[in-house]
Amino acid sequence: MATQSFSVAPSVQWTERDATLQTSPSVVVQGATVGKFQWGEVELPVLVTGGETGLVKKFFKPNDSTATDFLVIADFLSYSSMAWVTRVVGPLAKNSVTKGQTAITIKNKLDFETASPSASITWAGRYPGSLGNDIAINVCDSAGFPTWEFRNNFAYAPQSGEFHVVVVDKVGRITDSAGAVGQVDRISVSGTATAAGTISVAGEDIAYLDTDTPATLATKIGAALTALTDVYSSVVVKSNTVIVTHKAIGPQTVTAIVPDDKGLTATAVITTVGASGSIIEKYELMQNTQGSKKSDGANAYFKDVINDTSNWVYTFATALAAGVVELEGGVDDYNINRVAAIQVLNNAEAYDAKPVFAYCEELIEQQALIDLSTERKDTVSFVSPLRDTVVGNRGREMDDVVSWRESLVRDSSYFFMDDNWAYVYDKYNDKMRWIPACGGTAGVWARSIEIAGIYKSPAFHNRGKYNNYNRMAWSASSDERAVLYRNQINSIVTFSNEGIVLYGDKTGLTRPSAFDRINVRGLFIMAEQNIAAIAKYYLGENNDAFTRSLFSNAVRPYIRQLANMGAIYDGKVKCDEDNNTADVIAANQMVAGIWLKPEYSINWVYLDFAAVRPDMEFSEIESGGGIVAAS
């Protein structure tokens, strides 16, 4: 309550109270997952938006080693476009660094801020992985701009003290282009020797005899240039011609030739202009002075701009200088353990999520995933059997899936099991792959939350259809589904005319309870979060009748909304002197009882058909009379 200060003189005093606090049923639908990728922040959750396109932008396209992780997450993102994604690498992973230097490991921005590499490392790949070896950094100053190969990509020429910087894909893997092209020079030898002599080619003095022909001298030149492995990547001799390819990327000075006056001579021309590759990122009018600004007021200090915004490099340089820096030494390590990355997600305030899922190669990773949701109590973890349980295991799928469930040794309403793997197309590598269905099942739940509400079942024919699968590893029969369902395992069933459908909505809770269905668990997750969000505004207030009344009046409309939406049959809030005794008040607590009667989803439909004689009334059969026949 806000008041004016006391006044002795006549005045009007005012007070202000806020009795408008309220809440509405709402839930943020985004997933959380971990996996191995070719690129991206490591051990630091990244919010991917924009579906699969956003996943590629943050973590790059998959290769054979990362495809399963990638496709499981892409599967989820086809239903719900947002997810927290945490990349995992093995202990041997390295970032690429300035050519000729020893590679280091920088997992994320926090690592970079504490890194202190040797002074010889001026640039590094942003993240661990061999993909960083494809990168070069090309810096241009005012003197070199008129002939710079990338000059047409910039609107303004740099002035004295300014630099243009481009990050270049020299291989073509990043930009799906041809990559860098080495300059090719053709050296043509001609003339007739009048005496023994010497010709200088690329700084190498090559002697010839008075009997040597142009073809003979060309062979000698080829042998000399072949030894220059740091200069030329290829040397080919054809008759009196030597064709060389420069090792350095980008345009180069044509091979220098200095003939003598003994009759044999040579000329060099450029037949293929070198190219450094395709631009990934560019930075215009950078400066070396900290605090420098562009004319529009934007930051121009190169270290701040590049290190804060680049998705591909970090710079440790003290100053920019014209030239090309190639990166090397990046190493992939896909020998990972996902458990540590899963535990990073155990921060509900920082990483709001509902479905949690991941491709898991080991049982301990699935257990960690389940434990995460059980501890957070605001998410549901989705798991599928390990691959060999269902893929290529014809006839033993049911038994092995049940054994897998038993080996999980987990009993909680905060996880959800399906029984299948799916066969999907990997468009990035042009091949079919098996992936666990957990990403799709999590996506089906996320889609159901968005279109029907978290308090509705995501399963069966109305909301339980999958989008992306070519076929499933197996489809349990009715009898097999009954066995699986008794073990809290939800089947994914293939119907010839309706497609692939999730056929169950049980959580992993073994005891008979309302919480053994995911719609009830979802309802309580939402209600607990929504009401807790408003309850925090009562911290610091006095535990008196007025405060308790305010709280109750804020929650009652919420309960009515739940009932009107079909989430509950009925509900009640109690926050008064009965449950806020003197002891509770003295302990600086406020206690509220919130009781909800949840709706239940239909899992079985029983249809009772009866043949009725013409002289009978329907009311007679409604009482249950008649003979139950087997045929």
Swiss-Prot record:
Polymerizes as an extended structure around the baseplate-tail tube complex. During ejection, the sheath shifts to a contracted form, thereby making the inner tail tube protrude through the host cell envelope. Belongs to the myoviridae tail sheath protein family. Its main location: virion. It comes from Salmonella phage ViI. It comes from the Viruses. Homomultimer. GO terms for cellular component: host cell cytoplasm; virus tail, sheath. This is Tail sheath protein. Keywords: Host cytoplasm, Viral contractile tail ejection system, Viral genome ejection through host cell envelope, Viral penetration into host cytoplasm, Viral tail protein, Viral tail sheath protein, Virion, Virus entry into host cell. It is found in: Virion; Host cytoplasm. GO terms for biological process: symbiont genome ejection through host cell envelope, contractile tail mechanism.
